Curated annotation (Swiss-Prot):
Keywords: Chaperone, Cytoplasm, Stress response. Pfam families: GrpE (PF01025). This is Protein GrpE. The gene is grpE. CDD domains: GrpE (cd00446). NCBIfam families: PRK14139.1, PRK14140.1, PRK14150.1. It is found in: Cytoplasm. The keyword Chaperone applies. It comes from Methylococcus capsulatus (strain ATCC 33009 / NCIMB 11132 / Bath).
């Protein structure tokens, strides 16, 4: 090291020499031809926008589907419970139908069963459970299950002439079909 470097510190650092880049003068694109890079960028932007719009639409559709699924889950949550109550309702109705005596004890029993049945029907209505009792109606395979066919007699062909067991709907969804006898032609 030289004495000057020791007293003054190292000398000024050498500056890098500027690089000389040969640049061609920018040529203006001919008036009739658009810049290829600009067209590609616009096309890419258009494709990206299209993807974005499709993704937004897909998300909105998914949100709507999920909302509908949640609504249906709430609406039909009672389905299993309601199906379990149907035999209880049937038994009450049969018990009332069987209690035809005039004895005071039978009358009290019948009255209690009728009040219980009335409460059941009220609860069913409250929760959207409707009775399907198609006696005299046209046979509907979506709500009725034909157990037998009988000669028509006075009834019109393909109408329900007897109901073995009532059917039930939960918010217009079939819980149990009505078991019926249908008039033959």
């Amino acid at each position: 090291m030289s004495e000057e470097e020791l007293t003054n510190g190292p000398g000024p650092e050498p500056q890098p020499e500027p690089l000389e880049v040969e640049s061609a003068p920018l040529e203006a694109a001919p008036a009739g031809e658009p810049d290829k890079a600009l067209l590609e960028a616009q096309q890419q932007a258009s494709e990206n926008w299209d993807r974005f719009v499709r993704a937004q639409a897909e998300m909105e559709n998914l949100r709507r589907r999920l909302e509908k699924d949640i609504q249906n889950a709430h609406k039909y949550a009672l389905e299993k419970f309601a199906k379990e109550l149907l035999p209880v309702m049937d038994s009450l109705e049969l018990g009332i139908a069987a209690s035809t005596g005039d004895a005071p004890d039978v009358a009290k029993l019948r009255e209690g069963a009728e009040l219980t049945l009335k409460q059941f029907k009220s609860v069913f209505e409250k929760f959207g459970i409707a009775v399907v009792d198609p006696l005299g109606e046209k046979f509907n395979p979506e709500q009725h299950q034909a157990m037998a066919m009988e000669p028509a007699g006075e009834a019109e062909p393909n109408t329900v002439v007897k109901v073995f067991q009532k059917g039930y709907l939960l918010n217009d969804r079939l819980l149990r079909p009505a078991l019926v006898v249908v008039a033959q032609a």
